[in-house]
Amino acid sequence: MAYFLDFDERALKEWRKLGSTVREQLKKKLVEVLESPRIEANKLRGMPDCYKIKLRSSGYRLVYQVIDEKVVVFVISVGKRERSEVYSEAVKRIL
């Protein structure tokens, strides 16, 4: 079952600021995630139903939450991994 994609409005602003190559790389991974969103290796501890997509070469991370009741993959935060900012922003946004 394919999931739908939705963005937190702050995450959408972050998405729009990304360079085109980074955005294209994340798009490819998001297409895979929409088919099978619960990837255990990418599960985030301490954040219920949250997972990450990581681009190792550029250091970018995308944090998303799977909402089964609505069949939605909800993007919470997008950004560089530096000082774990992308993760701390995600925690603030889901609480």
Curated annotation (Swiss-Prot):
InterPro entries: RelE/ParE_toxin, RelE/ParE_toxin_dom_sf. The keyword Transferase does not apply. GO terms for cellular component: protein-DNA complex; toxin-antitoxin complex. It comes from the Bacteria. GO terms for molecular function: DNA-binding transcription repressor activity; endonuclease activity; ribosome binding; RNA endonuclease activity; rRNA binding; toxin sequestering activity; transcription cis-regulatory region binding. One of its GO terms (biological process) is regulation of DNA-templated transcription. It holds the Pfam family ParE_toxin. Changing K54A: Reduces mRNA cleavage rate constant 2700-fold. Induction: By amino acid starvation, by glucose starvation and by chloramphenicol; induction is independent of ppGpp. Autorepressed by RelB, RelE acts as a corepressor. Member of the relBEF operon. Operon induced by ectopic expression of toxins HicA, HipA, MazF, MqsR and itself, but not by YafQ. Keywords: Antibiotic resistance, Endonuclease, Hydrolase, Nuclease, Repressor, RNA-binding, rRNA-binding, Stress response, Toxin-antitoxin system, Transcription, Transcription regulation. Disruption phenotype: Cells missing relBE have a higher steady-state level of translation during amino acid starvation than wild-type cells. They survive antibiotic treatment in log phase better than wild-type cells. Cells missing mazE-mazF survive hydroxyurea treatment better than wild-type; further disruption of relE-relB and tonB yields even better survival. The record marks K54, R61 as: Transition state stabilizer. There are estimated to be 550-1100 RelB and 50-100 RelE molecules in rapidly growing cells of MG1655; as they have quite high affinity for each other (dissociation constant of 0.33 nM) there is probably less than 1 free RelE molecule per cell. The RelB(2)-RelE complex has a half-life of over 70 minutes. Toxic component of a type II toxin-antitoxin (TA) system. A sequence-specific, ribosome-dependent mRNA endoribonuclease that inhibits translation during amino acid starvation (the stringent response). In vitro acts by cleaving mRNA with high codon specificity in the ribosomal A site between positions 2 and 3. The stop codon UAG is cleaved at a fast rate while UAA and UGA are cleaved with intermediate and slow rates. In vitro mRNA cleavage can also occur in the ribosomal E site after peptide release from peptidyl-tRNA in the P site as well as on free 30S subunits. Belongs to the RelE toxin family. Forms an RelB(2)-RelE(2) heterotetramer. Also forms an RelB(2)-RelE heterotrimer. The RelB(2)-RelE complex is probably the one that binds DNA and represses transcription, possibly as 2 heterotrimers, 1 bound to each of 2 operators. RelE occupies the A site of the 70S ribosome, making extensive contacts with the 16S rRNA. Its presence blocks access of tRNAs and translation factors. RelB bound to RelE prevents RelE from entering the ribosomal A site and thus inhibits its endonuclease activity. This is mRNA interferase toxin RelE. It comes from Escherichia coli (strain K12). The lineage of its organism: Bacteria, Pseudomonadati, Pseudomonadota, Gammaproteobacteria, Enterobacterales. The gene is relE.
